[in-house]
Amino acid sequence: MEPPAAKRSRGCPAGDEPGTGARRSRPEPLLDLSAKRVAESWAFEQVEERFSRVPEPVQKRIVFWSFPRSEREICMYSSLGYQPPEGEQDTRVPFTRGLHLLQSGAVDRVLQVGFHLSGNIREVGGPGEPEHLYHVSISFDRCKITSVSCGCDNRDLFYCAHVVALSLYRIRHARQVELRLPISETLSQMNRDQLQKFVQYLISAHHTEVLPTAQRLADEILLLGSEINLVHGAPDPTAGAGTEDANCWHLDEEQIQEQVKQLLSNGGHYGASQQLRSMFSKVREMLRARDSNGARMLILMTEQFLQDPRLALWRQQGAGMTDKCRQLWDELGALWVCVILSPHCKPDERSGWLQLLGTWDKLDVCPLEEGNYSLDIPSLQPALTSRTGSEDEEEVTAASPRRTVFSRALQAGELHWNDSHLQRILASDSCGPTLTGSMGSDKPTFDPQGHPIWLGEPFPTACARVDTLRAHGYPHKALRLACAIINTLRLQRRHQLESYKQQKKELLQKGATGVTSTEGWVGHPLDPIGCLCRALLEACRLEEEPHSLFPDSAPEKRKLAYQHVLVPGSPGESYLALALEVALLGLGQQRALPEGLYAQDKVVRNEEQLLALLEEVELDERLVQVLRKQAGLLLEGGPFSGFGEVIFRESVPMHTCARYLFTALLPHDPDLAFRLALRAMRLPVLETTFPAGESHPNPLDSIMSNRFPRWFILGHLETRQCELASTMLTAAKGDTKWLHAVLGSVQQNIHSPALLFKLAQDACKTATPASAPPDTVLLGIALELGLQVMRMTLNTMTWRRREMVRWLVSCATEIGPPALMSIMKNWYSLFTPVEAVTIVAVTGTTHATLLRLQLDTAGREELWACARTLALQCAMKDPQNCALPALTLCEKNHAAFEAAYQIVLDAAAGGLGHAHLFTVARYMEHRGLPLRAYKLATLALAQLSIAFNQDSHPAVNDVLWACSLSHSLGRHELSAIVPLIIRSIHCAPMLSDILRRWTLSAPGLGPLGARRATKPLGTDRAPLCQLLDAAVAAYITTSHSRLTHISPRHYGDFIEFLGKARETFLLAPDGHLQFAQFLENLKQTYKGKKKLMLLVRERFG
């Protein structure tokens, strides 16, 4: 690798001096050119050791050029790169505040003594506050700030605004800064008297601070054997760093650790995750600048991540960490891969990092790559290997080692950059085959067209190299390697297609295939497809405005614009087209769904991220051609493509990718777009695994057993499948051929009733725009989908069934009377009887529906006849719940009403309950049909049985209503119902209540009625005498029953009961004699209950 490129300063140090333009036009003096190079690379101590005497002008130029010259580096160490809330405009970023202080003239008394810069910063206070004065000092060496000190109390990750202001002043106004040699050089020019005067004045000026230290040092110097006298020379803080000192930018390690710890403790908040991601971005920024602090900062962050107390808790519970935390760990692992793979790090640095990673990897709390701690979950891999027939692979999988988030980085430690072919690829855009062919390797190094390929390692590892090169500031080398990898993929695809053509007939006959890659590229821990796409897209990005020092801090992110950039050595190729090609290649790869909830979530998230990248690219004619070509290859890719004719049962579905391709291709090639999307509608994991021709006893059980516990994201996948179908239906509006093709695919592949219902609603909404006539074909498809939902959910009631049924009726209404009558005629395969009679028939015949259908009289009568037929059929199938609604619907048609009434009568003989019969009887009375009400009431009484102790039976009110109805109809009806009452009711209070009601005037007969002279019925004549005898007998039976197990606390209730019994006994002509005989019988029978009998005598004598 070439050495790091020299940084260019944003502005000339002499930029504010007069005559700057004239100086810029002249060549730079050789002294300055030499001093610049020395100042960048050599410590000043090394210069002094190399040359016995360095002239003062040379020393001054070296010291002058040793201060950092790039504002971008100052910005890197004074801004985290987060996006501030809207309206703040970066006021919290130290770099912005420091720039404002500089521009407002707040920097004063700047002095550079050797490699030490100092100055004062005056900052205006808030309202009513005095001006603040801060003293800032900066040490630097070899164009890097090595330490900072400021009087403010701001504690942040990076430099404060005052340090920024002083640094920017030194960069922009370098020649206005007073420059002195290191203080040791000045002291060496003084004689004894001058030195004594210097020391005394220094002590006098700062006696309160330095006097104790000065006295201690004086005592040690005067002591001959002291340690200070044994050391040659004296320290000079202004003389720069020594030869052995580390040369790196100042980084407050303690503050970084504290900040990460605090952010992790607030891990549930969105802002904490954003700030940690910003810190990761800062690490990448440092790596790109080839700053050694990138690795230092990553080590500090990793240590704090591993000390997160939640890790131990999650491990103890055997649970997975939160999604936000998991994503942060993924980013941490990816950064370590970039650091370990660094192409310019020293071997001892890499060894130290690998040792650290090895230690962390062995920790119990170190997160595993799949996202969870050790949980016993069913493994997919044995199933995969059994299908592919590879026993060796199964054994390897079963014995797979524990993989943590650092495993990939540890594996990267085994890689190197000294492969000769790899070096040739990275070195030149015009790398071509030589006479030696394969460069002495067994693997080919060029494709048949002479383009370099890279087969040295697995595809994800090769892509990690691309990401590493890009992360470390080698964008051109990253692009060269990315192109070689794409050439390799193309060559492999050609070989795969040739292999598939030979096996195509066999695979199609078999109807199944094994998965070709158990470790997919999308959702892979190394994100290979994302690495390639970002590297290629970055080369095509248009910079419409000057590059900002901190691009992420803009209040609103602009949509990125891309342009075609030609690939050197490949005419007609562009990086933008390659990015699109490789993204589609990765998204369309057939791959097995990984294990674990997080791994599956990651597949979905990674797919969405890649598609978001592609959606930023505006498609032109060249890219559309790439889309067409790749879509065709995906359709013909066989087992290597997720769009192939035959796919593995548990491969990742292509719905999301297909939706993007469909939308992109539709304006240019509708036929290809529909063929691709229809092919992607499959979700084979929901299909039963039984051989063709054998039906499963319960298909739902088969589906559920296949769903769990592995397919954690199945709900999400089904939703994406529904969205793809909805997009196709909307696009196919007006095209009968494709509409029916989409309908067939939906009916075959979508198995969720809820999603089918949503799809039907969407289709109906699309088919009935407010400002245009409806699309009848699409409406018919919406209705067909609704009918399928009804059939699927007929025997599995859901809380949304009523909503679905109502919607189906409204959809059929939109189509017209034939559709509405069709669902009424075929109701038995779609609805329950209750749904059909209470929702379908009622909604279909409302006034609003009739107006909507705009039917004439004959059409209305036909619809009513259909509804009445439905009602009668429902009443016959479920009279218990449908009889009354059927009668209501048939009110206006005498024949239908009579038929419904007859169904009720027949059902009464077949066991229709008394409660339903009473309900229908009351309805008949309300309709003015008392005789029919009476008939139904007698049928209900015949089924009723009320025991002696059921005073509060639910049917009490119905019985009293039936008695009142019979009383109002006349003596004949009353005489007929009395035997039923006596046979069905054995409750004495209830019988006496009925008896008293019948002794009053008949209800409904006013004083002017035709029977106003009729006398009230007497209890001494039939039919009431029979009821009186039954009531008396019931009281006698109930009394004996209660006395059998009576307790003293119920004596009072029993006395009240006897009081009511006496009232009933007295209704008979000889009632007091019967009651007296009854009491005497009680006294003789229960003479052992002396207290109770005493109470009876006291009350009744």
Curated annotation (Swiss-Prot):
Name used for this protein in its record: Zinc finger SWIM domain-containing protein 4
Keyword Transferase in record: no
Zinc finger (SWIM-type): 134-171
One Pfam family hit: ZSWIM4-8_C
Region listing for Disordered, in residue ranges: 1-29
Organism from which the protein derives: Mus musculus (Mouse)
GO MF annotation, one: zinc ion binding
Keywords noted in UniProt: Metal-binding, Zinc, Zinc-finger
Gene (UniProt): Zswim4
Domain of life according to the entry: Eukaryota
